[in-house]
Amino acid sequence: MGGCYSAYASSRKLRGRISKISLVIPDPVPDAEAASPRKDGVDGDGDDVRGGGGGCDDGGDVVAIATTTADEFARRYVLGKELGRGEFGVTRRCSDAATGEALACKTIRKHRRLAPPRVTAAKAAAAHGEDVKREVAIMRRMSSASSSRGGGAASSAAVVRLREACEDAADGSVHLVMELCEGGELFDRIVARGHYSERAAANIFRTIVDVVQLCHSNGVIHRDLKPENFLFANKSEDSPLKVIDFGLSVFFKPGDRFTEVVGSAYYMAPEVLRRSYGPEVDVWSAGVILYILLCGVPPFWGDNDEKIAQAILRGAIDFNREPLPRVSANAKDLVRRMLDPNPSTRLTAKQVLEHPWLKNADTAPNVSLGDAVRARLQQFSAMNKFKKKALGVVARNLPGEEVDKYVQMFHHMDKDKNGHLSLDELLEGLHINGQPVPEPEIRMLLEAADTDGNGTLDCDEFVTVSVHLKKMSNDEYLAAAFNYFDKDGSGFIELDELREEVGPNEQAILEILRDVDTDKDGRISYQEFELMMKSGADWRNASRHFSRANFSTLSRRLCKDTLTP
């Protein structure tokens, strides 16, 4: 799989063990609660934004979301084709019924939170409502801040504009209507332009850092900066680059520290894994993007999530990879200072913008970085598209929650009926249920899942971890994704089927085949597809619950010597 830098998979040893039991870590306890109008742990999803009046709220940095009806919403907006799908929602192209203006609509469906007996349905629904309110409040604040700026390197258009937000009175789903970005992804634009130089990278990167500075100056940590979250507004040569997704973002105040392990594997700062972080994590993630812009691959790479996390914690940056030896000293200095493992000495976003490499971006070397970098970026982008399609199918097929079964299992395993499962009760209960697991691994999982730190699991913790592991441990979802691509049912994903999903870019298709088609027969078998999905970062991170659980477990194991109790 050599060059497949965006693959999703897991440590086979850990995956094999975890798949035998019904445990994974639940959403962590909220942190820095006072800094946010809702709890830290947003589940809002719906992926990208690709491609006033009535019953909706428009603009304003408030958390109230007005209600509407399906008929009323349909009178105002015409929904079109699907643009992206996540675990809890879907993004579609839409248009203003009155003006015909092209827009995007991200619909976050009502997420039924796990509600064991002591948690009322009303309380669970309220928690979900707070989740969505935070995403809406952040988008409103950032839309307002961006539109009021004017001028500057990124001008006033660095953040996708939220037009309206409203909740369906019948099913509780929330519609976020926002501007449509049709200019394509960052890496696609770079590849299409042909000539790609350090100067071009500097001008692109200045916009990215300007977005980070805009977030931080408005009390927002993005927490999920990555190339896929930046789109061009339109196809014009001077189109603005916009950040599109605030689903994991949080409000913060100076001095706030967060503990929730969130983000995407390659872009995660070391202090996130250590469970104590602030806005500096966005600068780290932007530094990872800069490294990729300069050489086409991530600075911290591994065959699975654990190795990626280990590489991040080691912090060793390879400046010998072509073409980095030929890149200017200023560019490499900026990478080093943004990827400083110590957040207290890492540059701030404001300091990054004042760095000589960005202040003099227009005079940076205009010599091509070489075809190898463009090829790597093309490969990175093509594989992301292929993977994203597959993960969208997985998201569509995630099963409903089987809460009652796990509540009954909890009470059966709780021998002393004190409302908590001890290590001994877990070991005995798993053995009785035909799921014997070595004690050291049970200890590790218990520690990771025990959100209140009392050394046991209560019913809420047990049910949450059980349900989300069951969702993501079944490979039938991979089979469903494979069948989605295999339109003719031949048992192979063939060239025409790849073109239909990835687009007509022959070079991109060849890059996918080069990495995935291991027997070189010009098509992708299920075994090859499965191998692609199970190497690199864990494909199950498509579930934000699993992602939090996965990296929380890794952080506790890899950083146990530095974590505070």
From Swiss-Prot:
List localization entries.
Answer: Membrane
One GO cellular component term: nucleus
Tissue expression, as annotated, is: Expressed in spikelets and developing seeds.
Report residues binding Ca(2+) 2.
450, 452, 454, 456, 461
Quote the catalytic activity from the record: L-seryl-[protein] + ATP = O-phospho-L-seryl-[protein] + ADP + H(+); L-threonyl-[protein] + ATP = O-phospho-L-threonyl-[protein] + ADP + H(+)
Question: What is the phylogenetic placement of the source species in the record?
Answer: Eukaryota, Viridiplantae, Streptophyta, Embryophyta, Tracheophyta
Tell me what this protein is called.
Answer: Calcium-dependent protein kinase 21
Q: Which CDD domains does the protein's record reference?
A: EFh, STKc_CAMK
Q: Please give the sites of covalent lipid attachment annotated as N-myristoyl glycine.
A: 2
* Active-site residues, as the UniProt record annotates them: 224 (proton acceptor)
Q: What is the induction comment?
A: By abscisic acid (ABA) and salt stress.
One example of the protein's molecular function in GO is: calcium-dependent protein serine/threonine kinase activity
Q: What kind of membrane protein is this, topologically?
A: Lipid-anchor
Q: So what does this one do?
A: May play a role in signal transduction pathways that involve calcium as a second messenger. Functions in signal transduction pathways that positively regulate responses to abscisic acid (ABA) and salt stress.
Q: Which PROSITE patterns match?
A: EF_HAND_1, EF_HAND_2, PROTEIN_KINASE_ATP, PROTEIN_KINASE_DOM, PROTEIN_KINASE_ST
* All copies of domain Protein kinase, residue ranges: 77-358
What's the domain remark here? There are 3 contiguous domains conserved in the CDPK subfamily: a kinase domain, an autoinhibitory (junction) domain and a calmodulin-like domain. The autoinhibitory domain (364-394) inactivates kinase activity under calcium-free conditions.
- Quote the record's miscellaneous comment: Plants over-expressing CPK21 display enhanced tolerance to salt stress.
Q: Of which family is this protein a member? A: Belongs to the protein kinase superfamily. Ser/Thr protein kinase family. CDPK subfamily.
Q: Please report the organism this UniProt entry assigns to the protein.
A: Oryza sativa subsp. japonica
